């Protein structure tokens, strides 16, 4: 059976080579394509650049080929944009033309081939899903409704760290407790639910399944089969695991959370007065026939990945930078004590009074961008960009990390220096008002979660710094900030141990 598969694959490679050469010649005459390394038949540039298309590797290619370049990865065209002007073209000026999402063999599994909001193609389904999700998740009213819960969760983290006898001596991996906090923050909004402890069996199952989903989706291991369809049979085992994880996750979401809200029956109100949490609004849209049950479950899938994990990564990066820059940590602490008073715990409304804390959040998102390439875009039809022809269904990556770390545009960008947002970059905000700084993207497909992420980051980092002196573990002068990149993610490689010495008030 393996021999037969090999023979079919080799025959397919030969036929694909012939087709690729013919198509390449025809396209070369038709299109003025962006520059890039010379592709070879079938494989394109895959053998030259490999699977690991992280932001730093793509930055090196941009230095060689320019602010826009093309990689032919098997049968897929991948266009990388690395300048503010071109980013503006993709995300704003031609936001409709480049407003779709690329397909991918693994993401197709986890999103039901685009039945969600984040990864669906641009069109009526996306507009409907965005509208349905905005009211229960992404408004100032939601922030005001749930900010007391976020403050309570941050207070619980502080209490648990204080009670931990190891925290002030040998340290603890604080990410584990912060992960529970983030699940509770979002599950309060989604389901009016929270988990009492890290040992909760349901939380353990949920965390494990979401972690496996992220690992499978963000891995570069499957690129060869995605780029080169005739090699896809070799992905059979990988894709089988993806399908099993997807089915198990969706069943868990349905059985333990969605069905519970249906049973509570709070969506029976015709004037929406009985709607208590986000999923009630989503289920109300299902009852009206606007979406189906699968759409409901894929919305839950989006929030589990896009809201929980990315914010957690940013909190972890912020803690790491504060530990490694004690003078900055002390400035945050001094500001909180001076403005709010010693012992007054940071609340969401207080953040506006704490500009240095806000600058620390912005600098964390600049230097350690959780989604450094943003979520990939796609043009459904042939398009123009930077004077070049972009073939239909090209994958467009905006290297947002390089936009925010290019020394041609930023002063000493490699330094963690929040002061830049008081000095030369005082006008720059995280909402995309400057195309050099796009931690949440901008335009039609920007991340609506910015309205939740910024206050949660401010509350969490503020509470930790005002209650503890955060230090590296004994024997270390700093904690390791090596990066772990994914398909379009960036998180810390090692979940660091942090010493948290309580302050006395």
From Swiss-Prot:
Q: Which chemical reaction does it catalyze?
A: (E)-cinnamate + reduced [NADPH--hemoprotein reductase] + O2 = (E)-4-coumarate + oxidized [NADPH--hemoprotein reductase] + H2O + H(+)
Q: In which pathway does it act?
A: Phenylpropanoid metabolism; trans-4-coumarate biosynthesis; trans-4-coumarate from trans-cinnamate: step 1/1
Select a single GO molecular function from the record's annotations and give it.
heme binding
Keyword GTP-binding assigned to the entry: answer is no
Entry's EC annotation: 1.14.14.91
User: Transmembrane residues, as ranges?
Assistant: 3-23
Q: Which cellular components does GO assign to this protein?
A: membrane
Q: List the disulfide bonds.
A: none
Q: Which cofactor does it need?
A: heme
Query: Its topology with respect to the membrane?
Result: Single-pass membrane protein
Primary location class: membrane
Q: Which UniProt keywords apply?
A: Heme, Iron, Membrane, Metal-binding, Monooxygenase, Oxidoreductase, Transmembrane, Transmembrane helix
UniProt GO BP: lignin metabolic process
Q: Where on this chain does heme bind?
A: 447
Family (UniProt): Belongs to the cytochrome P450 family.
Function of the protein: Catalyzes the first oxidative step of the phenylpropanoid pathway in higher plants by transforming trans-cinnamate into p-coumarate. The compounds formed by this pathway are essential components for lignification, pollination, and defense against ultraviolet light, predators and pathogens.
Which PANTHER family does the entry link to?
Answer: TRANS-CINNAMATE 4-MONOOXYGENASE
Q: What name is this protein filed under? A: Trans-cinnamate 4-monooxygenase
The encoding gene: CYP73A2
């Amino acid at each position: 059976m393996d021999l037969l598969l090999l023979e079919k694959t080799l025959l397919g490679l030969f036929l694909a080579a012939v087709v690729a050469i013919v198509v390449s010649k025809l396209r070369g005459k038709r299109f003025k394509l962006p520059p890039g390394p010379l592709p070879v038949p079938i494989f394109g540039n895959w053998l030259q650049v490999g699977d690991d298309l992280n932001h730093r590797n793509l930055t090196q290619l941009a230095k060689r080929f320019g602010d826009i370049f093309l990689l032919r990865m098997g049968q897929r065209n991948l266009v990388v944009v690395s300048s503010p002007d071109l980013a503006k073209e993709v995300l704003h000026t031609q936001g409709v033309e480049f407003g779709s999402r690329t397909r991918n063999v693994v993401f197709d599994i986890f999103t039901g081939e685009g039945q969600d909001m984040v990864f669906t193609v641009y069109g009526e389904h996306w507009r409907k899903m965005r509208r349905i999700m905005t009211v229960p998740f992404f408004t100032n009213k939601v922030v005001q409704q749930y900010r007391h819960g976020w403050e309570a969760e941050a207070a619980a983290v502080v209490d648990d760290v204080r009670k931990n006898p190891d925290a002030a001596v040998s340290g603890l991996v604080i990410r584990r407790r912060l992960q529970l906090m983030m699940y509770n923050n979002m599950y309060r909004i989604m389901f009016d639910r929270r988990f009492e402890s890290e040992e909760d069996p349901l939380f353990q199952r949920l965390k494990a399944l979401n972690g496996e989903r992220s690992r499978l989706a963000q891995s570069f291991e499957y690129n060869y089969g995605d780029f080169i369809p005739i090699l896809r049979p070799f992905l059979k085992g990988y894709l089988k695991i993806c399908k099993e994880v997807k089915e198990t996750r969706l069943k868990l979401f349905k059985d333990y959370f969605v069905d519970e809200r249906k049973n509570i029956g709070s969506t029976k109100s015709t004037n929406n007065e009985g709607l208590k949490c986000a999923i009630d609004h989503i289920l109300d849209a299902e009852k009206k026939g606007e979406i189906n049950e699968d759409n409901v479950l894929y919305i839950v899938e989006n929030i589990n990945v896009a809201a929980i994990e990315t914010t957690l990564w940013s909190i972890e990066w912020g803690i790491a930078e504060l530990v490694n820059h004690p003078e900055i940590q002390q400035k945050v602490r001094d500001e909180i004590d001076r403005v709010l008073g010693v012992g007054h715990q940071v609340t969401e409304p207080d953040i506006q009074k704490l500009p240095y804390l806000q600058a620390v959040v912005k600098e964390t998102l600049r230097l350690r961008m959780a989604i450094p390439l943003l979520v990939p875009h796609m043009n459904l039809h042939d398009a123009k960009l930077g004077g070049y022809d972009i073939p239909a269904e090209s994958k467009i990556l905006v290297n947002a990390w390089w936009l925010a770390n290019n020394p041609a545009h930023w002063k000493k960008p490699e330094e963690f220096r929040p002061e830049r947002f008081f000095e030369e970059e005082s006008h720059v905000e995280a909402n995309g008002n400057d195309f050099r700084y796009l931690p949440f993207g901008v335009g039609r497909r920007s991340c609506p979660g910015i309205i939740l992420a910024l206050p949660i980051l401010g509350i969490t980092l503020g509470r930790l710094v005002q209650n503890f002196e955060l230090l590296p573990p004994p024997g270390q002068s700093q904690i390791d900030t090596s990066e772990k990149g994914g398909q379009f993610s960036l998180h810390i490689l090692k979940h660091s141990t942090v010493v948290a010495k309580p302050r006395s008030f």
